[in-house]
Amino acid sequence: MSAGRLPDFALDAAHPLGGRFASLGIRAYRDAASHVHLLPYGRNSDRSDWRLVLGEGRGTCSTKHALLAELAHENGRRVALVLGVYEMDEANTPGVGAVLKPNGLRSVPEAHCYLAYEGAHVDLTRQEGEECQILRFLHEEEIEPHQIGEYKLEVHKRFVRRWAEERGLDAVHLWRVREECISALADQPQFGRRLWEG
């Protein structure tokens, strides 16, 4: 979903984030969102610190969207950061089927962050096109940028435990398979600008 669904307003360069974007020649919110969208996927050196996205030139669904939510807040605008959990499968995340199938699974619960503005879900880390979109979230909640670390991980693990229990599966094994899926995705050459978190 494109940056065009986000509000557009001038960034205040007197504020810390506005100043960082201004130093890159970026003075409007949508331009900032487009810039962040084009940065490659990659875990930051501290995956819970969205402040590292611009300096490290990469980010994940959590760090990129948290940065943009905070940038909006800094400028007195409300753009929500949402944590969702969905069933990751080969259809919505090409490349994970090769890990899931040998483990007897069709899907595993995965956490994903995106932005919400005036009823629109805006995901700047997944490819455009419906075939790779997440069509249904099993859990969604608005979070603050500082919650993308431990809090997000705990929500995700708690959800995986419950999901596994409901299906008579081993939660530890399920989490291990999920980690293998993420590794398989990270190894894909086209992965760099596509999606993901961890």
Write out the residue ranges for each language-model feature.
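Short alpha-helical scaffolding segments that buttress acidic/His motifs in well-ordered protein cores
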Residues: 32-36
